Curated annotation (Swiss-Prot):
EC number: 6.1.1.10
Record key words, sorted: Aminoacyl-tRNA synthetase, ATP-binding, Cytoplasm, Ligase, Nucleotide-binding, Protein biosynthesis, RNA-binding, tRNA-binding
Catalysed reactions listed for this entry: tRNA(Met) + L-methionine + ATP = L-methionyl-tRNA(Met) + AMP + diphosphate
Protein name: Methionine--tRNA ligase
Function: Is required not only for elongation of protein synthesis but also for the initiation of all mRNA translation through initiator tRNA(fMet) aminoacylation.
'KMSKS' region (motif): residue ranges: 311-315
Major localization class: cytoplasm
Membrane spanning residue stretches: none
Length: 664
């Protein structure tokens, strides 16, 4: 049972509704839902928040393009998002919209408080601005920098997304970020689990705090779609304050009705994508410090759900619509895949092949067949009746009982750390062990010997109880399947579906099983893989006809022997961090994970890739080159790339190959 304070407040980012949501957005929200359901199962009083970030220049421009008002645009978009959450059976307790009055009135108060405290001041700002990112950048932060004949910067791209930036000069209010830098570092030290995974914390400290925090622009005057600054209404409160404070405004903070704030704040965990870690672990805690408010207990930054060819985009024809998958395959199938396939703190790759395999092997074969066989045997041998637990009869019984009890402990540990894929993998070990138990005990042989009836009855009980425990553990992840399992096992007593009922083996008693429909019909793999690929390609714009390329003459190098080639050590390396090298427009500093060790490599690809495009990619690295220093940075190898028409492309590799694999 939970501790004395049994509340649990969990949030997702609020989504920016400038385009249709894809499976990557569903990933975050389903993960948050699984955690919320798990905590409810454990007896916690849970508050799960999600919502939409509805202000900003991009929204205003989108509305103008459609000849509608920004409010009409966001009303439609928010309705679509809420419809998707309903289809995913997200159990959120609230949906906050930043255009709601309850949000705007508090934002006005917060801004005024920060102004009165001297944390915000008015000045003029000139900087490079990316509209899609709604972010200002300094010259040193830009990538793909363009210069004129005098060497002056005349353009570049966002280091976060690769979008072009434009030089903007305007009056702005600024937040004194540097004032709180030391206090923030101290908080990191005193709260080592505040930022998870650990690698994200190191990135924040080394890349942003140690180099020095610059004051942050927190208002805009070049558009008017947003919350106005009360004493200076030509200014609109910028996204950093407007969006981040949703976690408080949804609880009624600084209003007469602040019961929810008093009950649930500080948040137990903010779930965010890794691209917005900085805003949640630097800007957000500093603003809370300025208001003398408690900080959230944890920010968990998960990775991206990628495709084989990188991030999802319509231009690549690799966008996956979650609704398409739900309608054809079912909701539980999608939810299971999302949380089983990818370690939550890392990037993962969606493949149609992997999706279909998870359904056929894990769900249909392992789980579905186990339930079908168990119910059929209990019906056949004991007219569907399950009695009470008599204890283990054989060593096989003892082993299965032990595995079940250890599974519950390991599952609980994984869930507390938000290791969803580990929790499901642990549960599937119990399911696999239960399948093996059938082969070990051979009930069909026991049934032929009347003297073995007690042993046979014990086998049937252990099968049913293992399935009941599995159904309880599935409840955070799957919304329909656990109830179908309880129904087929004849379980109507709600106490047998609760967490407390699985801490010790043997709680099931006096039920009658009933045959039901198969949980997961098996799919025709090739047909379904082709279907999903077709839907993905359908997301791409029509391609123009291309002329067939003529063969080109190339300069050939002298031939080498196989022994000479084998002297070059090529290995699969995953990019875990990437950043520009200071005062070097062409260089990126990459942190590579080789599986057996981590290395730093400096590569001359900064004009062709943003850091974010590389993080999560598996590349080919030459690992036995002598280390060198480039612009003062140690480089312990080289990544392979090819050049065509002046454009460099890194050599990527099948994402399923393990890190460190030798390439021959």
């Amino acid at each position: 049972m939970p501790q004395e304070n049994n509340t649990f407040y969990i949030t997702t980012p609020i989504y920016y509704p400038s385009g249709k949501l894809h499976i990557g957005h569903a990933y975050t929200t389903v993960a948050g839902d699984a955690m919320a359901r798990y905590k409810r199962l454990k007896g916690f009083d849970v508050r799960y928040l999600t919502g939409t970030d509805e202000h900003g220049q991009k929204i205003q421009q989108k509305a103008e393009q459609e000849n509608i008002t920004p409010q009409e645009y966001v009303d439609r978009a928010a309705a679509d998002i809420q419809k998707l959450w309903k289809q995913l059976e997200i159990s959120n307790d609230d949906f906050i919209r930043t255009t709601e009055k309850r949000h705007k009135v508090v934002i006005e108060k917060v801004f005024q408080k920060l102004l009165d405290n001297g944390d915000i001041y008015l000045d003029e700002y000139e900087g490079w601005y990316s509209i899609p990112d709604e972010t200002f950048y300094t010259e040193t932060q830009l990538v793909d920098i363009e210069r004129n004949e005098k060497g002056e910067v005349i353009g570049g791209k966002s280091p976060d997304s690769g979008h072009p930036v434009e030089l903007i000069k305007e009056e702005s209010y600024f937040f004194r970020m540097g004032k709180y830098a030391d206090r923030l570092l101290k908080y990191y030290e005193e709260n080592p689990t505040f930022i998870q995974p650990e690698s994200r914390k190191n990135e924040m400290i080394n890349n942003f705090i140690k180099p020095g925090l610059e004051d942050l622009a927190v208002s805009r005057t070049t558009f008017d779609w947003g919350v106005k600054v009360p004493e200076n209404p030509k200014h609109v409160v910028y996204v950093w304050i407007d969006a981040l404070f949703n976690y408080l405004t949804a609880l009624g903070y600084d209003t007469e009705n602040d019961e929810l704030y008093q009950k649930y704040w500080p948040a137990d965990v903010h779930l965010v994508g890794k691209e917005i870690v900085r805003f949640h672990t630097i800007y957000w805690p500093i603003m809370l410090m300025a208001l003398d408010l408690p900080l959230p207990k944890q920010v968990f930054a998960h990775g991206w759900l990628l495709m084989k060819d990188g991030k999802m985009s319509k231009s690549k024809g690799n966008v996956v619509d979650p609704v398409t998958l739900i309608e054809r395959y079912g909701l539980d199938e999608l939810r299971y895949y999302l949380l089983r396939e990818v370690p939550f703190g890392s990037d993962g790759v969606f493949t149609p092949e992997g999706f279909v395999e998870r359904i056929n092997y894990d769900l249909a074969n392992d789980l579905g067949n186990l339930l079908n066989r168990t119910v059929a045997m209990i019906n056949k041998y004991f007219d569907g009746q399950i009695g009470s637990y008599k204890g283990a009869v054989t060593e096989f019984d003892h082993t299965l009982t032990s595995v079940a009890e250890e599974t519950v402990k390991a599952y609980e540990k994984a869930m507390e750390n938000m290791e969803f894929s580990v929790a499901l993998s642990t549960l599937w070990q119990l399911i696999s062990r239960t399948n093996k138990y059938i082969d070990e005990t051979a009930p069909w042989v026991l049934a032929k010997d009347p003297a073995k009836e007690e042993e046979l009855r014990s086998v049937m009980y252990h099968l049913a109880e293992s399935l009941r425990i599995s159904a309880v553990l599935l409840q955070p992840f799957l919304t329909k399947t656990p109830e179908k399992m309880f129904e087929q096992l004849g379980i109507t007593d709600e106490s047998l579906k609760a967490w407390d009922s699985i801490t010790a083996f043997g709680q099931l008693k006096d039920t009658k099983v009933q045959k039901g429909e198969p949980l997961f019909p098996r799919l025709e793999a090739e047909e379904e893989i082709a279907y999903i690929k077709g839907k993905m390609q359908g997301s791409a714009p029509a391609k123009e006809e291309t002329k067939e390329e003529e063969p080109q003459e190339v300069d050939r190098l002298p031939e080498i022997t196989i022994d000479q080639f084998m002297d070059v050590e090529l290995r699969v390396a995953e990019v875990i961090e990437a950043e520009p090298v200071k005062k070097a427009d062409r260089l990126l500093k990459l942190q590579l994970d080789l599986g057996f060790e981590k290395r730093q490599v400096v590569s001359g690809i900064a004009k062709h890739y943003t850091p974010e495009e590389l993080v999560g990619k598996k590349l080919v690295c030459v690992t036995n080159l002598k280390p060198v220093k480039l612009r003062g940075e140690l480089s312990q190898g080289m990544i392979l790339a090819g050049e065509a028409d002046g454009v460099l492309k890194v050599v990527s590799i099948d994402q399923s190959l393990p890190k460190g694999t030798r390439i021959k």
